[in-house]
């Protein structure tokens, strides 16, 4: 049944990825599955320290600009690029219509700086003069079939430090209020009202930090660590002033999210959208269609949509996202790391009052930031 699909589509993965939530967290994950979709639906894995590293793999780019200091003449046997470390001996490169063979690189010890030794007019093309700053395209590497002692191309992953954040909200209720029975709404909650309010405040704060946290480390005893949110973890495809922001069209959405994620090497599966995008889909003539994603244990349907022009991409409305915001995720690379799953810590009775705290500690873990996209600043929508 749909409840057991993978990805941040339902709350099932929150229960089945390494951390078994205790009772109060299980209640929160289910009760707030639509209000706080990432906290509720993403897989949960343990974190054993106040901070951890988020890994961004660093593969060879397919192009690099010339940095020759002038035009490359048709007779030149070397070229300077912006970053020669991405190239290897035997690489076939292309500038304009000319193909060239790389015969020497800094890593092989045959050149220095960012200089490449090249064979001109390779593969039947003609050597020509090329203007500086043109892109140097990496076509492919080609070997003789009997080479030895090949020097590897080292691409060291980028590691970003993420900080576990503690969120804590108290509930305090007097005995007289606890004894009142005529103010409760007909929509019952799993726990008493004050405890549920504290639980919602914790879930709201944690979800909002996942979006907008800036990152504050532990530097002294009085530090208040803050996780880095998705808006700060995503650097490559982070759009804050989108083209056509006041007349945003479906093509703009695809360009800023899906296309950007694919270009970065990702496999986008989910769009998390602010609620105004639901109106945007209607303006575009592609109203979001609800999918049957099951319901939580309390019988509430789980919000999950698709739009006709985004077939196969799940759309999840996120009430706590600011207007004009959309997040595109390659969901297998996103998870919640918990140092302390949500706990209910009663302080007990004090006089004629009952008190306690709802506490959780953790952070978002998002691998390979170039595989995802963040867009904000959309102010109005226009038909395609």
Feature roles, as predicted:
Residues 50-64, 244-342:
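Extended oligomerization regions of viral-like shell subunits
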Residues 154-253:
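Alpha-helical scaffold segments that mediate packing/assembly in large oligomeric complexes
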Residues 55, 75, 80-82, 96, ...:
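A structural detector for beta-sheet-dominated domains
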Residues 2-23, 46-55, 304-306, 314, ...:
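Hydrophobic, glycine-enriched assembly/anchoring segments
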Residues 4-129, 382:
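Autoprocessing Asn-cyclization modules and mimics
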Residues 106, 122, 275-277, 319, ...:
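Short, flexible loop/turn elements at secondary-structure junctions
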Residues 7-16, 99, 108-175:
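Cys-His-centered catalytic/binding microenvironment captured across papain-like cysteine peptidases
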């Amino acid at each position: 049944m749909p409840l057991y699909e993978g990805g941040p589509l339902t709350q099932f993965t929150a229960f089945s990825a390494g951390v078994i939530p205790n009772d109060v967290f299980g209640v929160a994950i289910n009760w707030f599955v639509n209000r706080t979709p990432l906290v509720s639906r993403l897989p949960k894995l343990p974190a054993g320290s106040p901070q951890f590293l988020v890994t961004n793999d660093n593969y060879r780019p397919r192009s690099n600009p010339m940095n020759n200091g002038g035009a490359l003449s048709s007779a030149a046997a070397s070229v300077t690029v912006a970053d020669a470390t991405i190239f290897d001996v035997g690489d076939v490169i292309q500038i304009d219509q000319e193909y060239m063979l790389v015969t020497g690189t800094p890593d092989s010890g045959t050149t220095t700086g960012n200089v490449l030794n090249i064979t001109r007019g390779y593969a039947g093309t003609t050597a020509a003069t090329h203007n500086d700053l043109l892109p140097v395209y990496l076509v492919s590497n080609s070997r003789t079939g009997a080479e030895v002692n090949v020097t590897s191309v080292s691409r060291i992953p980028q590691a970003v430090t993420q900080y576990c954040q503690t969120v804590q909200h108290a509930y305090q209720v007097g005995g007289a209020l606890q004894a009142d029975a005529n103010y409760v709404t007909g929509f019952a909650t799993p726990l008493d009202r004050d405890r549920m309010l504290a639980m919602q405040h914790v879930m709201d704060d944690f979800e909002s930090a996942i979006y907008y946290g800036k990152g504050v480390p532990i530097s002294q005893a009085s530090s208040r660590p803050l996780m880095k949110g998705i808006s700060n973890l995503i650097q490559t495809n982070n759009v804050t002033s989108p083209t056509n922001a006041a007349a945003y069209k479906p093509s703009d959405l695809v360009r800023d999210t899906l296309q950007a994620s694919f270009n970065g090497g990702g496999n986008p599966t989910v769009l998390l959208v602010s609620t105004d995008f639901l109106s945007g889909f209607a303006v575009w003539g592609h109203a979001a269609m609800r999918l049957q994603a099951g319901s939580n244990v309390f019988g509430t349907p789980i919000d999950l949509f698709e739009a006709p022009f985004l077939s196969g991409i799940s759309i999840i409305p996120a009430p706590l996202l600011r207007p004009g915001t959309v997040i595109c995720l390659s969901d297998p690379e996103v998870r919640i790391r918990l140092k302390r799953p949500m706990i209910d810590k009663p302080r007990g009775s004090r006089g004629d009052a009952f008190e306690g705290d709802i506490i959780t500690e953790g952070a978002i873990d998002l691998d390979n930031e170039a595989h995802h996209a963040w867009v904000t600043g959309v102010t109005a929508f226009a038909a395609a």
